[in-house]
């Protein structure tokens, strides 16, 4: 059945329409006058309607597939509470919030990327066939993000909620929102890695190469203030560095001085994170469009 997509690709929709109207099927089953009138008066569906229909269908399909994968679903539900409990067990004493928030940021990025990194590469052939019948890239990406971010909301709620039972965050809601924004960017990054990869094994190999520098250059393993100036500059290309600074500024301002971040750097951090979001999203859309040209 999949070969029908290859056959459909040989002609444009207008050519198929013209061929049908000349065929015996059209003559036998259509009233020419009524058909012509109804056809001429018919309005083409709006782009918004088409997007919404595709989006709802894709979300329903993707969510059903996800919840039926019991092993993956179990990991996505239980891993965040386990991480939060381990943070509570390990860190204590004055300034423990600095380390706890660091693990929260790294965990958020790791979960966002790892949740998404298999999504596109695993269904590349399905995606390419559906693009032949007018699958919308915005609808496709929006459906992926909607389901993945639903799980991210739960995971971040667990991370912040459980750790706040032990650690003092001056703004829990603000920390939650910052981590969720970080998760959005990390999820797009994971989808980008998935779109670039030809196999799942390659995607999983690339993932640590992205995540390990996030840990090293976030600003805690080596305090930001103790880094050489050029290393400080290099650390600026990593999402974790800005998410960590923003989280400390919002929820444990004393940690900003301990690490050596700029106490007035929140606006810059937001700006750079937003720039990363659009760069990753632009690269993802470009990669998906490039798949249309590949056989």
What residue spans do the PLM features occupy?
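ABC ATPase nucleotide-binding domains
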Residues: 1-37
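Short, membrane-interfacial amphipathic segments enriched in basic
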Residues: 36-60, 232-239
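Membrane-spanning alpha-helical segments of multipass transporters and channels
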Residues: 1-13, 63-295
